[in-house]
Amino acid sequence: ETNSIVSVHVYDIKDRVTTPMNIGEETDIYIPRIKWTKDPKRLAIMKLNRFQNHLEILLANARVGSTTVLYREENKYYIDESNLDNLVFLDNGTQFVITSEKSGYMHLYLYDLNGRERQAITKGNFDIIDFYGYDPVRKLFYYSSYEESPLEKYIYSINEKGLKKKLTPVKGWNEASFSKNFNYYINVVSNTDTPPVTALYNAKGKQVRVLEDNKAVKEAVKAYNLAKPEFIQIPAADGKTMLNAWIMKPVNQKTGKKYPLLITQYSGPNSQQVKNNWSLSWLNYLAQEGYIVACIDPRGTAARGEEFRKCTYMQLGKL
């Protein structure tokens, strides 16, 4: 069956004219995202080959349809989809931010609209997870990452000189939502001991107020004396790679007694099941009923760099 041919068109609401954008002669492609720049006459068109290992971002003149290549990246495995969502054009109209794994880890990079890389905003042996945006007043980039542990997610701000500040002091898994002007953000944090706590913070990282602490949930669960996951590492089949895992044992486990073991896992590319967050499910019930429950994040899962994440490329089901 012949693949569909994709094209991009801009419709002028006032003049009622449709203009096709020039995306090149190659037809066996994807257009996974399109995005307006800060200039209403310029459109960014993302173009991927079928193997998804060659990305081009075209800068299109929305009035006449002409395009130039703004950004190009090739990867020996594939371009991770999260890079596409992390493209952000800055309000100054001359720069954009995108994530890339070209260093072996997912990091933020600043480019100008001539396609020149200005700097790596973040560096190190850890992956960026989310890019929340740029505050032009405070000149700060906001992001989340695994830089303290593959099991935990924290929120940070960083300036163009690399000065970084951690905005989430509570240990565990953090999710943030920023106000439009970055004056405030709502953070939701949990860990294996604490159900989600939702709080409002100001731009300096100071807590304004707790919106929901879930203390009632925490106290109610305490009465059941539920088993908690214990984080461990186990060797992979290659004998060298250590895999993150958790194990949950019956609270009243007796030494020397054998227990049935249930292993649960998802293992999809770039997925993650082993993390320090609140989770309450039938797995806790099984542990209460005399089962040992374990979960493993094997090779190909998230939080440990490109080589670990993409080693299953063309090898899915073998590693």
Named regions from a protein language model:
Residues 1-184, 190-196, 200-201:
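Beta-propeller folds
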Residues 40, 175-319:
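Serine-hydrolase catalytic core recognition
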